[in-house]
């Protein structure tokens, strides 16, 4: 019985030690552990549509771009700069539309968490 009591006591003390170390970390360290790459990527774009990481649905706010031109942009990446979109096989009307809205776009490095699978084409949001 005393052997069992010692083991349980040791386990409890170790658990408390680990919990104590975790709780005494500065909040900034804890927050850094909770943040993920997607949160960082969203913060990096400053409200603009990231051409290398956005889904086609992000283009709905720009009349005429969704779904055809948005699909071409999403599939045609990755891009080094916003103007690289104009190298795609676009109609004159699509080029005009892109020029009209290009100040609303930005380019960051592609993030695997945002580009995996077909989520950029169909991100599963339905009305």
From Swiss-Prot:
Gene3D superfamilies: Photosystem II 12 kDa extrinsic protein
Entry GO terms, CC: extrinsic component of membrane; photosystem II oxygen evolving complex; plasma membrane-derived thylakoid membrane
Coiled coil region boundaries: none
GO biological process terms, semicolon-separated: photosynthesis; photosystem II stabilization
Protein origin, superkingdom: Bacteria
Free-text function comment from the UniProt entry: One of the extrinsic, lumenal subunits of photosystem II (PSII). PSII is a light-driven water plastoquinone oxidoreductase, using light energy to abstract electrons from H(2)O, generating a proton gradient subsequently used for ATP formation. The extrinsic proteins stabilize the structure of photosystem II oxygen-evolving complex (OEC), the ion environment of oxygen evolution and protect the OEC against heat-induced inactivation.
Protein name: Photosystem II extrinsic protein U
Provenance organism: Synechococcus sp. (strain RCC307)
Source organism phylogeny: Bacteria, Bacillati, Cyanobacteriota, Cyanophyceae, Synechococcales
